[in-house]
């Protein structure tokens, strides 16, 4: 969206636009056709089943579960100023719990964070390696680790969650415009 706002991308109306989900069309409409959604990623977390069992910890099912003192130093997540994943986490908590409630949630979660990372996927990768128990991540990142054979359980929290829409754009003045149109 930022590239569209800054005039770096050009409008394109794909003949396939009518086949897309509403969430994919929304960025297209909002930018006058300068970007289109290509994936939707829901926020959540994943945990290492083996570490959880070894430490005798209950399986978390909700965002609020992560505030329990049993998870002190068991959670890794990215830092909001360096990671879109963490920024989405902060924004999601505000949307779920209200402004004061969201910031209070983040303060409570901070008490259980072992480490903040620059990358949004670092926490779940560390959980896959057995270095941390829980990683806050877009759920597809946890699923990727699970289907790769790691003992990871992906969680879509019970309270609901936020999400991102990844989008694609054609750069203004693209050298391979026809190829770009086919991709979009």
Regions inferred by a protein language model and the residue ranges of each:
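Periplasmic-binding protein-like
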Residues: 105-110, 116-117, 148-177
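Extracytoplasmic ligand-binding site segments that recognize negatively charged/polar headgroups
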Residues: 1-131
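Active-site-proximal beta-strand/loop segments in catalytic clefts of secreted hydrolases
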Residues: 78-80, 138-140, 157-158
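Short, catalytically relevant binding-site loops at active-site mouths
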Residues: 123-124, 140-144, 159-162
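A ligand-binding cleft/hinge motif common to bilobed small-molecule-binding domains
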Residues: 1-2, 128, 133-151
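Bilobed periplasmic-binding protein/Venus flytrap-like ligand-binding cleft at the lobe interface
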Residues: 62-69, 167-184
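Loop/turn elements at helix/coil->beta-strand transitions in domains of secreted/extracellular proteins
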Residues: 71-75, 130-133, 150-152, 178-181
